[in-house]
Curated annotation (Swiss-Prot):
This is V-type ATP synthase beta chain. Pfam families: ATP-synt_ab, ATP-synt_ab_N, ATP-synt_VA_C. Produces ATP from ADP in the presence of a proton gradient across the membrane. The V-type beta chain is a regulatory subunit. Transmembrane segments: none annotated. One of its GO terms (molecular function) is ATP binding. Keywords: ATP synthesis, Hydrogen ion transport, Ion transport, Transport. Belongs to the ATPase alpha/beta chains family. PANTHER family: V-TYPE PROTON ATPASE SUBUNIT B. The lineage of its organism: Bacteria, Thermotogati, Deinococcota, Deinococci, Thermales. The keyword Calcium does not apply. GO terms for biological process: proton motive force-driven plasma membrane ATP synthesis. It comes from Thermus thermophilus (strain ATCC 27634 / DSM 579 / HB8). InterPro entries: ATP-synt_VA_C, ATPase_a/bsu_AS, ATPase_F1/V1/A1_a/bsu_N, ATPase_F1/V1/A1_a/bsu_nucl-bd, P-loop_NTPase, V-ATPase_su_B/beta. The keyword Lipoprotein does not apply.
Amino acid sequence: MDLLKKEYTGITYISGPLLFVENAKDLAYGAIVDIKDGTGRVRGGQVIEVSEEYAVIQVFEETTGLDLATTSVSLVEDVARLGVSKEMLGRRFNGIGKPIDGLPPITPEKRLPITGLPLNPVARRKPEQFIQTGISTIDVMNTLVRGQKLPIFSGSGLPANEIAAQIARQATVRPDLSGEGEKEEPFAVVFAAMGITQRELSYFIQEFERTGALSRSVLFLNKADDPTIERILTPRMALTVAEYLAFEHDYHVLVILTDMTNYCEALREIGAAREEIPGRRGYPGYMYTDLATIYERAGVVEGKKGSVTQIPILSMPDDDRTHPIPDLTGYITEGQIQLSRELHRKGIYPPIDPLPSLSRLMNNGVGKGKTREDHKQVSDQLYSAYANGVDIRKLVAIIGEDALTENDRRYLQFADAFERFFINQGQQNRSIEESLQIAWALLSMLPQGELKRISKDHIGKYYGQKLEEIWGAPQALD
């Protein structure tokens, strides 16, 4: 600790959560500062803009009680840093990394900048190992791969929080079966919630504790009534811990970020306070770049055994996929999982619609030695058959079911069964083998001649499974 600290007293203007300081030439962008008022109370803050005339500081707490004459600013750290340690597993922190579980502070092994360390693009390896989420629609049709960034597009009132908690509880890495031996690899979940209500906070804490998932997880929980700047820091805090566990301790880390819409709203709020020229729908023009600094921290690095995988979750305002937040997220990430309001109305959980969903890296992480040799062909056939069934369902609404051919009726029956037994799994944790077994039972409802996307070898090996044999009759298609 420095014995002498330089204090800046030239506070010229206070606007909402922002402080404007004159002649602060030693303050750099991103620096962490202490702000002391006339009563001696100290608040934290971060430098978010620097010019020749002044520095702009975002205060981490409310600015009530600050006045121009008695307020002073002193430098704490050159950039925002987080003390990290393996002790963080099993712990809960607020949005800026302070413990909120009643336990003592951790003893940090390192203090790392929350913006992340520069990564040579050439050092990145191609993601190609499967992560099992236990959710059939994701594992079979939109496979998550280690090092991938795969967002979930939700909407108001859809069960995104429940799906986030379920993935955090069930997700696991599977050994590479193509190698010699099957060594268990360490796996951890870093969960960051931004702008959540007290009810949502209680739900996440109870779910992690009730299911035992907390022991392998690190939680960062930013509440809706916490300072706006905390929402900007929270995902970066989470990713700093994830990178440390992955690249220092060889963990495969799954980072779940919810809700990125609240993060972007915080960006817009800060931009308005700084009187920046707004971009699309009032969001800052640099939002694409800002989101990229978060999403691009996923990956696998040459020479490192660990990996960082991201599942950002965002709520689409008015279910609009062209809204700037899902639109820009889609440009940066590698696919999307789309939640369906129609499936949700039918009581189907999780209401994941496979047709608009996509995992661009799926082909890298499936097949013999990774999942199963028939995986990709089964996925393609499920897409084709379900899409056909959905089209026929729309046709029935116009001309009625009497005009359908026998083959059309099979596809219609397939679509109904697919939603009921494959998509609608509730809180069940399914292995990839169980999911593929259900998929084959559903595909066996169709004539073999209709399975044009599956090889004859695979049809001969797996075709003929009955739903009744999986669930024990007679519930299959009653």
